Amino acid sequence: FQLVNLLRDKNLSFDDPKIIAKTGWTTGELIEAVEKEGVSAVFDLVTLLVGVNNQYRGLSKEEYKAEFGHLLDTAIAFAGGKREHVYVLSIPDWGVTNFAVANGKNAKIVAEEIDAFNNINREEAMYKHVGYIDITAGSRELGKKAVMLAQDGLHPSAEMYAEWASSIANEIVLTGNFNV
């Protein structure tokens, strides 16, 4: 909702968002949910951010690539085939969070794995000619600050989501892909 409100503040007209994904899902779980939801509408804007739980659970990069590609095709269909209305967001790095530290996770290894998954989603976004927004660098910088994390010390807070929403809104305005 933060993103749509920011875009509305920039005189862009958007309907209220439909959010399908839930925190904690893998690509496979998101595919199942999309199919179960039976969404057939066309949306002005579609964003896709998924994969951190594939990495966290140790799922294969090959599986991620196949499932992410399927989800990206679905996102493009949800945008009525308008690839310029689809944005992939990179996976944030949870390895810098209090949760990771408290659970003895090696931040360097987590970062390397997150980067590998992000290489996949970036390549898929480029191949399918959709927008790509890197939020990983910001998550590494800001994820150490308690205010940027929910009380569990792992998930993003409203403040972190606001940072991401601002980045996305600025990118959308810069591209000029939406009418004012």
Predicted features along the sequence, with ranges:
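Residue-level recognition of beta-strand->loop/alpha-helix junctions
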Residues: 18-21, 90, 134-137
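Alpha/beta-hydrolase-fold catalytic nucleophile elbow
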Residues: 49, 89-90
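Secondary-structure boundary motif
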Residues: 9, 36-40, 77-81, 126-127, ...
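A structural motif corresponding to the C-terminal end of an alpha-helix
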Residues: 7-10, 74-86, 120-133
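Conserved SGNH/GDSL esterase-like catalytic core that processes O-acyl groups on lipids
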Residues: 1-73, 80
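A generic "cationic amphipathic patch" detector
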Residues: 30-33, 56-59, 77, 99, ...
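Catalytic His-Asp segment of secreted/periplasmic serine-dependent ester chemistry enzymes
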Residues: 93-180
